[in-house]
Design a protein with these regions (language model features):
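Formylglycine-dependent sulfatase
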Residues: 1-461, 467-470, 482-502, 521-523
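A short N-terminal helical cap/helix-turn-helix that marks the beginning
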Residues: 508-509
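Residues forming the ATP-binding cleft of Hanks-type serine/threonine protein kinase domains
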Residues: 478
Length: 524
């Protein structure tokens, strides 16, 4: 037998939101304890800074340019590789409860399994697998889905409609009647995607995901290993946690982020030093992606709005930490407390006021790219607590799950098993990670490639409608941890830039088969 695996993800959570990572707003004792017992990674990077490509990389162990789900709204091919299929073959019971997002949410005809299962009333469905066989959907025996608020025909929305229909209007409407991301403001400050939600905490999707996970775990046998992916939709916008909880973090007492320049002129100068789409989005001249409200202009963001958004975000993080604690207690009650590997991370980050911006997009800086990652191996293995400072990637998760299960990584996995110490990371050449962005929206094409090492963050903009291929960004992380001074054109770093460019080229031209890029089927 291998070991049982609890894989926990959140959506759009920054590295610095956890207490163990220096966060000051949220109390996260459960996750902090897991980090103290296991391995904490100081520089974990996503393969993409948006949901669908990043989540598809966690499942497949491949970069977006390999698995083909290159943008939100582009479904991961139904026969794409899936680590859950390998675990299922190894005898594991497999479940995904919460947010999946391998397929578009905007699917009025129910073309995709993620949007059909709740109405069908079945736990999974048979589909084609990567190796030509047919089996349970993406390798999961059991699926229950949720997303932000009550969007889509998912299990959480069905639960709310059937049991608490009167509470549905309390949630923020993520998409407006024009099918654009809603720009309406709320709360005390009029911040976009904010609403005071009267829903009782026990009906909110964070507790629902934990409750459904606990129920599934209680049904598992002692003589069978399991892999459970528990996936919380928060702290992704909209920021509409239960109103009963918002007093935990009074927004008026929240300090402004260290990377929020209060002066408009300072913000503009910082943005002008980056590639031009930064400033043009800030001014409202372009909408380069669907990841933020199209009708919202970032330059209108006020300091109080930043405070309120960060306060509500912190509340959501606290609720997640408490929900994780409940699930871990249920595991202990089953007698499995020492025999479960727990891995926690998020799919990408959130700007949260950095550079005067909110949300996400083709902006490859730490706010979006530096993620929390904690691996607490089963206590029965007597793990040595450690901190890994070398760069690692979410693309390594699939191989890591299989290693825990006692199985080798398949040939299609592009990521190697996560190192358990800095010495191991160095010995195994964990020296660089890669992040990709491709988008085509509103007639604007943006293509970004980034390599991150221990010392540098280097970005190239490939030719598109916004860039001619000559632009880029280069930050010296030791001197400039906030990525404010772009040294892409600094002659003193010419040799460094050449080395990093060579690493990026190696990533772009790496060997191996790649899926045909998927077709954009929906905005998200």
């Amino acid at each position: 037998m291998g070991r049982r695996i609890l894989f926990i993800t959140t959506d759009q959570q920054r590295y610095d939101t956890l207490g163990v990572n220096g966060g000051q707003l949220s109390r996260t004792p459960v996750l902090d304890k897991l980090a103290a017992q296991g391995i904490r990674y100081e520089r974990c990077q996503p393969t993409s800074v948006v949901c669908m490509p990043s989540r598809s990389s966690m499942l497949t162990g491949q970069f977006p340019s390999t698995h083909g789900a290159w943008m939100n709204g582009v479904p991961l091919a139904i026969d794409a590789p899936s680590v859950a299929e390998n675990l299922h073959d190894a005898g594991y019971a497999t479940a995904l409860i919460g947010k999946a997002h391998f397929e578009p949410f905007m699917d009025p005809f129910g073309l995709y399994a993620e949007n059909a299962l709740a109405n069908l009333g079945i736990p999974t469905i048979e589909q084609d697998w990567f190796d030509g066989r047919r089996g349970v959907h993406r390798g999961f025996d059991y699926l229950e889905f949720a997303t932000h608020g009550v969007m889509g025909p998912l299990h959480y929305a069905k639960y709310m409609n059937e049991h608490h229909a009167d509470a549905i209007t309390g949630f923020y409407q993520v998409v407006d009647h024009s099918l654009n991301v809603n720009a309406a403001g709320g709360g005390d400050t009029g911040a976009p995607q904010v609403k005071f939600n009267p829903v009782p905490r026990e009906w909110y999707h964070t507790d629902w995901v934990a409750d459904r996970t606990i129920r599934w775990l209680e049904e598992q046998r002692d003589d069978r290993d399991w892999f459970c992916w528990m996936s919380f939709p928060d702290p992704h916008h909209p920021w509409d946690p239960p109103k009963s909880e918002i007093a935990r973090v009074p927004w008026r007492e929240v300090p402004l982020p260290v990377n929020y320049p209060e002066s408009a002129s300072e913000r503009e100068a910082l943005l002008d030093a980056k590639a031009r789409h930064w400033r043009e989005w800030y001014d409202g001249r372009v909408v380069s992606n669907y990841e933020a409200p199209a009708k919202w202009v970032p330059s209108t963001l006020t300091s109080d709005q930043v405070r309120e958004v960060n306060a509500l975000n912190a509340v959501e993080v606290e609720l997640i930490d408490e929900a994780i604690g409940r699930v871990l207690k249920s595991i202990e009650a089953k007698g499995w407390g020492d025999d479960v590997d727990v891995i926690f991370t998020s799919d990408h980050g959130e700007l949260q006021g950095d550079f005067g911006l909110l949300f996400k997009g083709p902006y490859h800086v730490d706010g979006l790219m530096r993620l929390p990652l904690i691996w607490r191996p089963a206590l029965s293995t007597k793990p040595e607590p450690s901190v890994v400072r070398a760069p690692v990637s979410l693309v390594s998760l699939a191989a890591t799950f299989l290693d825990v299960a006692g199985k080798p990584a398949p040939s299609w996995a592009e990521g190697a098993v996560l190192p358990s110490s800095d010495d191991e990371a160095k010995a195994r050449s964990f020296d660089a990670t890669f992040t990709e962005w491709d988008s085509s929206f509103f007639g604007i094409d943006v293509h970004v490639r980034t390599v991150v090492t221990e010392d540098y963050l280097y970005t190239e903009y490939l030719p598109g409608t916004m860039h001619d291929g000559s632009e880029g960004e280069l930050y010296v992380l030791g001197d400039d941890p906030l990525q404010r001074v772009n040294r892409f054109d600094d002659p003193a770093l010419a040799s460094v830039r050449a080395t990093l460019a060579e690493q990026l080229a190696g990533h772009e031209h790496r060997p191996g088969e790649r899926a045909t890029p998927g077709i954009l089927m929906a905005p998200v």
